């Protein structure tokens, strides 16, 4: 989706600095640096990195793609896809540039709606085709909002979607989602699957990412719950 990514960024860069900073919810401290970095997107000498190394959030820290072997990278290229509001859907090896963006951003000269809406028709058939080619099951480890990039009901009709949830048991016995732990577990789970070449659901359930353990009592066929504590 390189052509679409260029169109998105060309439209983004027509916005003023303050308008762009507001859309991206940048703090005053980050406004100048963040918008300046985006404005280098089309510079010919800008550094590009593989997508799995370009992002620095907690999920990607725990994925730890910098420690992948050549065989890990090859397997990940066949089995892992990364969502992006600028690039759409990425292979972990695809070289990209800095692309901080929000799905709710509206770019009237590109599309009559949000970036979420812009991408749905592009990405839905592609994701379905990729999942079917890889065996027909999607283990969804992205954040919940990323469903908005797709016609999600159509995806769920076409392929088997499994969504893990990671919950921490409180002293009261209640289960609670803690966002940073969820991000850590998602990245660790993806990394373990890649390094161990795991393709069976039973093997996925047996994983204990960041200490979270699969709980049959709290899970259904497609909504899996992993519990810590």
Where are these regions (language model features)?
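Active-site helix-to-loop segments that bind/position phosphate- or nucleotide-bearing substrates
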Residues: 1-67
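Internal, well-folded beta-alpha domain core
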Residues: 65-229
